Amino acid sequence: MKTFAYTTRYKTLPGDLHTPVSTYLKVRDLFPQSILLESSDYHGVENNRSFIGLNPIASFSVNHGIVTTVFPDKSREERPLTPDFQVEDAFQYFLRQFQVEGEYARYGGVYGYTTFNAVRYFEQIPVKDSSDPKNDAPEILYILYKYLIVFNDFQSEMVLVELQGNDEPSHIDEVEKAVLNRNYTTYAFRATGDTTSTLTDEEHKTNIRKGIDHCKRGDVFQIVLSRRFIQRYEGDDFTLYRALRSINPSPYLFYFDFGGFRIFGSSPETHCKIEAGKATIDPIAGTTRRSGDKKTDAALTEALLADPKENAEHMMLVDLARNDLSRNCHDTHVEFYKQPQYYSHVIHLVSRVSGTLDKEADPIKTFIDTFPAGTLSGAPKVKAMQLISEIEPHNRGAYGGCIGFIGLNGDLNQAITIRTFVSRNNELWFQAGGGIVAKSDENNELQEVNNKLGALKKAILLAEKI
């Protein structure tokens, strides 16, 4: 097995005159297919880090059952998945071919996404294949970047990090020159035509009634059913990202440019985070609208906390998260329970479940065993996913999957891909859903989808004014 060894070369610069957004605007044309990850965590800025990844040098992808790996020496390998060579085996084989040492080796890893469609490789789920030529993005895609720009909000500094191979010249000065350039260009964004959906309101309500019937029959306790919206546009979708991050600051803000398509959003929910052998899941279950008025929001929060349907649903999904982690962890417990968290258009109830990885546990397998989130599928998870594939008119693509970082050291941080746009060929896809139980009301569930999409729709309007 060939290996690629790197040492992290770095430069620390004052960060008080540079924001992640302005820096990204400076470097994106010089370094195509770059990415931006930000955090806007209301718990405090001491742990906030933002990242820009530049110059893809290696990638791991899975599509239609074929694993494709591309390496820094431009070599390329393709291999089909088999019962003896599954996704976690392929991923670990890929990651083992990289060695990173140095001061910032902990940031050595791959950045990318796992679509909801990838469940076909983990469970017996008949995911609908897409016949849409515009929907040819890999089901799983993670990329290793040559350069990282790391922003430390608390210390007001940024660090330029380069993966430097043996006997390889450094080009970190070129990145520094681009960052220190005071000039950058922004471009307009304009929505064209009306927002459409692949389901009418009545068709989605019909699907909700199907979900309620399955719950009443005992097929599932809960099922998450979603609908997709489509908006044509002209101009620069990064301007839309800027609007979204302004309207809906979240723990996970991201803009991934993959060349032919982009994925960007503002997710509130941690799917799975592993750091120093500790794994956490932050299930969100229970949502109500946010009015913007302090007294009204307090009353809405109290009503949400007292709602027996929402309480039962939340408890069930916390138990599901605990069971998922227990497959590879011990000392699994709930750190906090039903904490109200406030976002631009909604109020969520959030819990945190954590556990310590077993001695022989593999982080990639631990992540896969929690995928997808119960909050985006239902319970029991496998049966819910089978029904989702049957009821929803198309596969979900990125929606409901994960996006984030997987480290060479075993750490990972994955957000659930919600409150997210997929952009391709001047067309935006965005999607939202809600958890259906036996006592659900179809009109309330329809409104919950609209509440969750409120930030995205408002961002489209704001982006046209930037």
Residue ranges of model-derived segments:
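Extended alpha-helical targeting/anchoring segments
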Residues: 1-466
